[in-house]
From Swiss-Prot:
Source organism (scientific name): Mycobacterium tuberculosis (strain ATCC 25618 / H37Rv)
Alphabetically ordered keywords of this record: Pyrimidine biosynthesis, Transferase
Enzyme Commission number(s): 2.1.3.2
Name this polypeptide is given: Aspartate carbamoyltransferase catalytic subunit
Pathway the protein contributes to: Pyrimidine metabolism; UMP biosynthesis via de novo pathway; (S)-dihydroorotate from bicarbonate: step 2/3
Gene name per UniProt: pyrB
Amino acid sequence: MTPRHLLTAADLSRDDATAILDDADRFAQALVGRDIKKLPTLRGRTVVTMFYENSTRTRVSFEVAGKWMSADVINVSAAGSSVGKGESLRDTALTLRAAGADALIIRHPASGAAHLLAQWTGAHNDGPAVINAGDGTHEHPTQALLDALTIRQRLGGIEGRRIVIVGDILHSRVARSNVMLLDTLGAEVVLVAPPTLLPVGVTGWPATVSHDFDAELPAADAVLMLRVQAERMNGGFFPSVREYSVRYGLTERRQAMLPGHAVVLHPGPMVRGMEITSSVADSSQSAVLQQVSNGVQVRMAVLFHVLVGAQDAGKEGAA
């Protein structure tokens, strides 16, 4: 992992990823029983969130993570900043660097935006840490980390587990990051989607590809359902919403085909009735709300790793 950045799941070795997951658990434990959820870990640090796409879970969890670690958290959005007046992303980034930001957390519709931000602000390796909170259809590494943490908590481990990812793989930054991270952690990954929703070159990914959802269910340890990202489409990817749901939706019938220990995940937002029914989403096998809770502690661990370092995480978490 690049010490000052988290731009892609490929930045993470198995040791890096495991350390972040372990530290996420430590930070969560350190907060148990506190009337005021505050740790002094990042006191005096300034964290800036830069969200150029709509977000609820990711934006809020990064803000909460920073505040629970006593960082000063500042929000920048296109609507409420000079971006709305035409300022470029580069100029905004350089302005925030000059203002003394210690970390920049960016979500942007353009793939590669986080990498560019790191280049622009880190010319002399003394700029702010950059964390990718989702860039176009490219990647979303912290989502993959919180998914991995949830799987580990539910199943007791990730090594050797069979994880089935279903839906709009083509447009999903979550799928890309999860495939890389889960493979790094020793899981077997299966991608299930219609041919039209699979990216070119997917056969080169460390995953098996299937078009038959039912066939993959009996051996699945976890099923990660993905929303169809209609906002990134011009139509024509499948005949109808109803047909898509019939073939690739996680219904009660399909849930009954899963092993009893299997866990159901969804990165959100969910489109109930399309890729997942309400009864499945709200069932005991569903870990959707656990994912949200884990998002805060994972992002606490990521902020700590890029701003301070892993060596004192246990000591800081207990402070």
